[in-house]
Each structure stands twice: as structure tokens, then as C-alpha cells.
Amino acid sequence: MEILPVGEESLGVRSMCLYVETRDVRILFDAGVSLAPRRFGLPPHPRELERARSVRGEIVRLAQQADIITVSHYHRDHFTPWYPSVYMATDGETYKKVYGGKKVLMKSPADLNWSQRRRHYGLAKALQEAGAKAVYADGGEWRIGGTVIRASPPLWHGPAGSKTGRVIAFAVSDGEERLVFVPDVEGPVEPEPVAFLEEVKPTVVVVGGPPTYLGWELERALQRLTEIIDIGPHTLVLAHHLLRDLAWREKIEAVLQRAEKRGVRVATYAGLLGRKDELLEAMRRDLYAAEPAAAQPAEEGIDEGD
């Protein structure tokens, strides 16, 4: 199994895009990228805008190779929109380059909030225009040669009852490795993501960690991460919300110690690529201080919760 990180906070953008290739199938998980419209009262620095364009180019390139593309939920950093956006590095045709003719395993709208349901409607229409085959994936399973792809039931995007709605996780097994992609569970804080992992018994876990930068109470998230380590993967990739905090390692020190004791490698997307973390969003204030730049006009319709 080949695992290639594409975009994520350690690579300078908001994303969890990941490319996975087995002997039988090529999958691009969550083909999206975006930037926080405001952080520390500042809009994206030009270096962030440049990085978003770079990641978008890689998403388009890998999408054209992929057989399957996923949409775990309808936040803008997890799918390619059908309209132009500076913060998502799209024009009006980008979605066709990403989704055109592809099989898209996507979150069902059945239990979505109004905001995500509206985005689902727009994306579903765009997928039809692009000639994609959209499949609601919640709880489903697909066998392609010797590879099995499995989707979880809906999981909370953070604590139960969260206004940010629900997501789905994906597991890929090729008979040697078992990877589970668990986006935006914000820890996790609820037991259901851990239960899904216990069923799959993954060798590699890619999980959206807790948003420590928002001042969260961490105890439940740290406990869940410890439970994931105890399942016994050889690699735990911590991603997304957690890496919007420059001090994230210090705040999860107990988890890192547990992983070391159990022989579990803890990595970031950048680390998997052999690169240093570049937490550009968390560095935004410092970037403006070191490299002063005129603030770009705010992009309408984009909010912090996306």
C-alpha cells in the first residue's frame, strides 16, 4: 500500500487530503483545501495563498490518476467546490478536473445540518454535471480485487450533538496493511470512532486531532487517543485541527509517551513525507511580522467554522 499525504495543516493549509494506492485501486481521500479567513485577526498571508495553489495543483494531478474520490463531509476543506475561490484555489472548472468521470464515495445528506445539506446539494449537482458516479457511502463496503474499502456509520464532528454535524471514516485493507482515515472527529472525543477502529484493527490510523487552539478541554480526547494506541497500529498520524496550535506536542505529551511505550510511531503528514512541519496558519502572525504584506480583501461567504 502506497500512502501519499497531499494537503494538511503540517503542509501549510487546511485539508486532510490523502492519496492511497493498492495493487487494485487508487483512492483520493477528501480532495479539498482551504485557508482560515481570519486567524489572530489577520487574513491568509501570501505564503498561505501560494501554498493553497500548490496543494490544489497536486490534488488535481492525483485526482486524474484516482479511481475513487471520497467526501467525508461537506466542510470546504474536504471537497472541491464548483465555484471560484481564492481561499480554496479554484476556478469555475476545477471541480470537473477533480471529479470528472470518477466514482465518488460521499456522506449521505440524511442526517446533515442545514449548512452541510445545502453544500451537499450544490456538490451533488456539480458531480452530475461532471459525469461522476456519486455513491452514498455511510456504512457501506466495496471489494475491488484483493482490496476492501469500508465506510463507517456517521460519526460526530467533535462532541455528540455538535452543530458542525457528522462525518464518515473510511478503512482500506489490501491484505497486508489496514489504513483507517478518520477525519474531523476532533480528538476523537466520542467512543464511536474508537469502536470502528477496534473492528478494523488498523495498522495505520490517520485521525483528525482535537482543536487545542480553541481552548478545548482535552481529557476525553487524550483518553480516546490512548485507546487508539492500545489497539496496536504501527503508525498513528495526527492531523488537522490539532496542528493549528504551535504547542500541540506539549499539550498531548501523555499520548506521545504512551505511543513510545507501546512502540507506535506518531507522525504528521509532513513527517510521512520526510519534511518538517510548516504550520503556516498557526504562524500567520509571525509571517506578517517577518514578511509584511498587504492584506487581501476578505472572501465573502467563508467563515471560520468551514
UniProtKB/Swiss-Prot annotation:
<dbReference type="InterPro" id="IPR014426">
    <property type="entry name" value="UPF0282_hydrls"/>
</dbReference>
<dbReference type="InterPro" id="IPR050114">
    <property type="entry name" value="UPF0173_UPF0282_UlaG_hydrolase"/>
</dbReference>
<dbReference type="InterPro" id="IPR036866">
    <property type="entry name" value="RibonucZ/Hydroxyglut_hydro"/>
</dbReference>
<protein>
    <recommendedName>
        <fullName>UPF0282 protein Pars_1056</fullName>
    </recommendedName>
</protein>
<dbReference type="Pfam" id="PF13483">
    <property type="entry name" value="Lactamase_B_3"/>
</dbReference>
<comment type="similarity">
    <text>Belongs to the UPF0282 family.</text>
</comment>
